[in-house]
């Protein structure tokens, strides 16, 4: 497991037209978006799994939908992120596919 520090590069991703900044190359498989950054109008449901390595998260959700996203250089893709109480968004391997 990698320790998350300020040495990781950041990247801004646009999801459904909303910009999110997060850390890249953190070792997570599925991207994690901070609950405080997640729009309250976007649907979520309780995740059917636990997350490991980012501390003890009391509430773990997942986006109810697969969302369209765009990288900083116009790369297009889809994402169904995890949403929980982390201090910063963590971009995972799911965005590298």
PLM-predicted stretches and their roles:
Residues 1-3:
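Short glycine- and acidic-rich boundary segments immediately preceding or forming the N-terminal edge
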Residues 8, 14-97:
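Aspartic protease
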């Amino acid at each position: 497991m990698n320790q998350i520090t300020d040495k990781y590069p950041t990247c801004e991703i646009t999801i459904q037209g909303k910009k999110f900044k997060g850390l890249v190359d953190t070792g997570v498989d599925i991207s994690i978006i901070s609950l405080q950054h997640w729009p309250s109008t976007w649907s979520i449901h309780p995740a059917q799994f636990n997350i490991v390595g980012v501390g003890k998260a009391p509430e773990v959700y997942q986006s109810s939908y697969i969302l369209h996203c765009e990288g900083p250089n116009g790369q297009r893709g889809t994402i169904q992120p995890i949403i929980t109480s982390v201090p910063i968004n963590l971009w995972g391997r799911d965005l590298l596919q």
